[in-house]
């Protein structure tokens, strides 16, 4: 039995997440009262009509505040049923949430005559704090379009060949912001930049000319060896501590050359010693 709890601030992509899960065989329930979570887990577990039952529910700020405050206790009760229970928390920065509500002209569930949209978003953050604190996986949707969000959910939640900690090695560009859901961040902007080579500028770190250029740089090799040595030593400790998800982010200026090259090499190397290692290039 697998239960995925989807939460997050309004406008962050919860409906999209439920759509993806439903498309992949999950029985989905929107806006479940949090107080019913243990009973739902019990009912789904004993439902003999479902083979390998998969259930996904969204729990958001429309719940009773007292139920949201009790979420840690309710989650513990659900997990006591001996089921796999993952908490996915989606979020975006406040400016992006304001922009999305402005574009769609939808009403925020917590706005009223005495509370502005910006105030409602901040109140919602406080209400959902107990869920965010216990999230197994957080996805920042600020810079993701609909299709990228769908791909990210499928990659992180549904593409796990074996049980255990799921590791994601992700490249990114600092000019578009650092991924807020990263557990470990490595800055490789000090390395030689292929962007300043006219013949390499239009290529990415996946292309052989850039690979050859970076592989020949001593500083690049030293940086790669230091990062890979650190990860090979400490990632197994993360797995041993029962972490469900670990994201390793490698950043350069634009997210096209250096970070992509390092990320690809690290992903291939880590896949030889760890299970469930995935690679993603955010800004390609």
Swiss-Prot record:
Binding-site residues, ATP: 8-15
Disulphide bridges: none
TM ranges: none
InterPro entries named among the record's database cross-references: P-loop_NTPase, RapZ-like, RapZ-like_N, RapZ_C
KW GTP-binding (keyword) present: yes
Keyword list, A-Z: ATP-binding, GTP-binding, Nucleotide-binding
Annotated GO MF terms: ATP binding; GTP binding
Binding-site residues, GTP: 60-63
Family named by the database record: Belongs to the RapZ-like family.
Function: Displays ATPase and GTPase activities.
Protein name: Nucleotide-binding protein PputGB1_0956
Protein source organism: Pseudomonas putida (strain GB-1)
Source lineage: Bacteria, Pseudomonadati, Pseudomonadota, Gammaproteobacteria, Pseudomonadales
């Amino acid at each position: 039995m697998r239960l995925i709890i989807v939460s997050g601030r309004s406008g962050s992509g919860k409906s999209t997440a439920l759509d993806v899960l439903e498309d992949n065989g999950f029985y989905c329930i929107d806006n479940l009262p949090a107080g019913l979570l243990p009973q739902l887990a019990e009912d789904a577990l004993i439902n003999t009509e479902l083979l390998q039952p998969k259930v996904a529910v969204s729990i958001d700020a429309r719940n009773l505040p007292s139920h949201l405050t009790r979420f840690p206790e309710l989650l513990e009760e659900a997990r006591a049923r001996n089921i796999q229970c993952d908490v996915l928390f989606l979020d975006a920065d406040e400016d992006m949430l304001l922009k999305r509500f402005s574009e769609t002209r939808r009403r925020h569930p917590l706005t009223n005559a005495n509370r502005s949209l910006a105030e409602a978003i901040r109140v919602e953050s406080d209400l959902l704090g107990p869920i965010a604190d216990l999230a197994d996986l957080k996805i920042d949707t600020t810079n993701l379009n609909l299709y990228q969000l769908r791909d990210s959910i499928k990659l992180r939640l549904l593409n796990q060949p074996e049980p255990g900690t799921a590791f994601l090695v992700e490249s990114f560009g600092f000019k578009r912001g650092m991924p807020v859901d990263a557990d470990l961040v490595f800055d490789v902007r000090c390395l030689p930049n292929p962007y300043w080579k006219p013949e390499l500028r239009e290529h990415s770190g996946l292309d052989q000319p850039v690979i050859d250029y970076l592989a020949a740089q001593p500083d690049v090799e030293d940086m790669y060896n230091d990062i890979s040595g650190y990860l090979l030593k400490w990632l197994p400790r993360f797995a041993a501590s029962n972490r469900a998800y670990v994201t390793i982010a490698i950043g350069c200026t634009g997210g096209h050359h250096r970070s992509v090259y390092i990320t690809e090499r690290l992903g291939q190397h880590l896949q030889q010693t760890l299970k469930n290692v995935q690679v993603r290039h955010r800004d390609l």
